[in-house]
């Protein structure tokens, strides 16, 4: 959890926002997936948001569902994902690592055991996409017991009650949703959510990172200009993996070319 705090403090000092890429662990295979993650970090990623392949990803659009299918085709298991996380943490001791996942994967292990394992491999945060805040108590309590930040989604239509709950229960960062619906770069991010950012600040919520539909540098700059701490980009990155699936070196080069201007857009 402290890794987020020190990251946001450093970025503030440098007058920068955070650029956070999302990829699915094990897509398109374990070895290439680890190279992809190294490349994202070398190109300027400030933190990582990682998915564990799951058979029924509700909040994901087709691009990220395909990533999950590729990881499954490569035989990637949750146990191997945790081995990968341990390797990533060993190699990159300071970068915040977040998991974006579904409740079934947490239940399969047992809630407490799952968060204990997260702590052991050096995961900083977990967002359970299909658990609404009013049902989140067992998850967030286990998370805090194991020094893992529970992350909550703030939808564009959040009312005051929800904003207060998010501020009160969330740690690490707040996942600010650009718009309703499923993930995907085809649907561009909506207008900057200034009023939500202001409210979250007022209630002392964890710093907001805006996600969903972030696929161009101007969409990274807009939320930061509106007061958000940064932006998360997933589908646009996963699409690059898909496009170069048979050319691993080209894929890494293309990822670098995509991430560098996205990170540059966080600098005021």
Curated annotation (Swiss-Prot):
Give the record's keywords alphabetically: Amino-acid biosynthesis, Aromatic amino acid biosynthesis, Lyase, Tryptophan biosynthesis
Keyword Lyase assigned: yes
Pathway connected to this protein? Amino-acid biosynthesis; L-tryptophan biosynthesis; L-tryptophan from chorismate: step 5/5
Q: Which domain of life is it from?
A: Bacteria
Per the Swiss-Prot or TrEMBL record, the active site comprises 49, 60
SUPFAM superfamilies per record: Ribulose-phoshate binding barrel
Annotated EC: 4.2.1.20
- Pfam families assigned to the protein according to its UniProt record, in alphabetical order: Trp_syntA
Task: Tell me one GO molecular function of this protein.
Answer: tryptophan synthase activity
Q: Which reaction does it catalyse?
A: (1S,2R)-1-C-(indol-3-yl)glycerol 3-phosphate + L-serine = D-glyceraldehyde 3-phosphate + L-tryptophan + H2O
What GO cellular component term, any one, is given? cytosol
Q: So what family is this one in?
A: Belongs to the TrpA family.
Role, per record: The alpha subunit is responsible for the aldol cleavage of indoleglycerol phosphate to indole and glyceraldehyde 3-phosphate.
Q: Which PANTHER family match?
A: TRYPTOPHAN SYNTHASE ALPHA CHAIN, CHLOROPLASTIC, TRYPTOPHAN SYNTHASE, ALPHA CHAIN
- Quaternary organization: Tetramer of two alpha and two beta chains.
Which protein, by its recorded name, is this? Tryptophan synthase alpha chain
Its source organism is Escherichia coli O139:H28 (strain E24377A / ETEC)
Q: Which gene encodes it?
A: trpA
């Amino acid at each position: 959890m402290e890794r987020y705090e020190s990251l946001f403090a450093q970025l503030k000092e440098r007058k920068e926002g955070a650029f956070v890429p999302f990829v699915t662990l094990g897509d398109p295979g374990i070895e290439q997936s680890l190279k992809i993650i190294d490349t994202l970090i070398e190109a300027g990623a400030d933190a990582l948001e990682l998915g564990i392949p799951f058979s029924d990803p509700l909040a994901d659009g087709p691009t990220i569902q395909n990533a999950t299918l590729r990881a499954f085709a490569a035989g990637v298991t949750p146990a191997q994902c945790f081995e990968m996380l341990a390797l990533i943490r060993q190699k990159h001791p300071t970068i915040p690592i977040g998991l974006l996942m579904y409740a079934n994967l947490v239940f399969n292990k047992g809630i407490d055991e799952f968060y204990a394992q997260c702590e052991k491999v050096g995961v900083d945060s977990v967002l359970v996409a299909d658990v609404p805040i009013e049902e989140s108590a067992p998850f967030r309590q286990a998370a805090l017991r194991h020094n893992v930040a529970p992350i909550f989604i703030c939808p564009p239509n959040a009312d005051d009650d929800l904003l207060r709950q998010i501020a009160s229960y969330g740690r690490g960062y707040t996942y600010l949703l650009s718009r309703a619906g499923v993930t995907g770069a085809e649907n561009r991010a909506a207008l900057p959510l200034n009023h939500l950012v202001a409210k979250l600040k007022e209630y002392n919520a964890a710093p907001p990172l805006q996600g969903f539909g972030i696929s161009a540098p101007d969409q990274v700059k807009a939320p930061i200009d509106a007061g958000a701490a940064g932006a998360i980009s997933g589908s646009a990155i996963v699409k690059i993996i898909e496009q170069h699936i048979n050319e691993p070196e080209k894929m890494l080069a293309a990822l670098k070319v995509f991430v560098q201007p996205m990170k540059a857009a966080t600098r005021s």
